[in-house]
């Protein structure tokens, strides 16, 4: 999994050199930032169920037709509604992973690379997940550096879907 720190170490190692002073400063900056990222990940994890449920309702409010579309991938049944919450929870989980590692590596590796194909295969609209992520961003209750950290990865996911 790629993070700014693992990339710096990998580059230095492949060139047979020590980390540059700039890379070391980046590492110290990440360690200072880590507290905020871990706090954001903890708070989002604790609120994941309620955030996912609220985000689902925000999607249904903006796109009411999704609750009447029939099929295994839509919200006309309880199974469809449960899948929606599960999928939104997956996005929240990816944001928490990014907060922990301090980079977009988890999202790049496990979400962004195949999201267009998944959405196309299951006839899912990226705009639904964009709306869900906007809800999460507006309602996560974080503040200060923790909010900045989480919001940057939420925005990254939104941009990947757009």
From Swiss-Prot:
GO biological process, one term: photosynthesis
tRNA-binding in keyword set: no
Binding site for (2R,3E)-phycocyanobilin: 84
Superkingdom, natural source: Bacteria
Segments crossing the lipid bilayer: none
SUPFAM superfamilies tied to this protein: Globin-like
Gene3D superfamilies: Phycocyanins
Record PTM text: Contains one covalently linked bilin chromophore.
Topology in membrane: Peripheral membrane protein
Family, per entry: Belongs to the phycobiliprotein family.
NCBIfam families cross-referenced by the UniProt entry: phycocy_alpha
Designated name of the protein: C-phycocyanin-1 alpha subunit
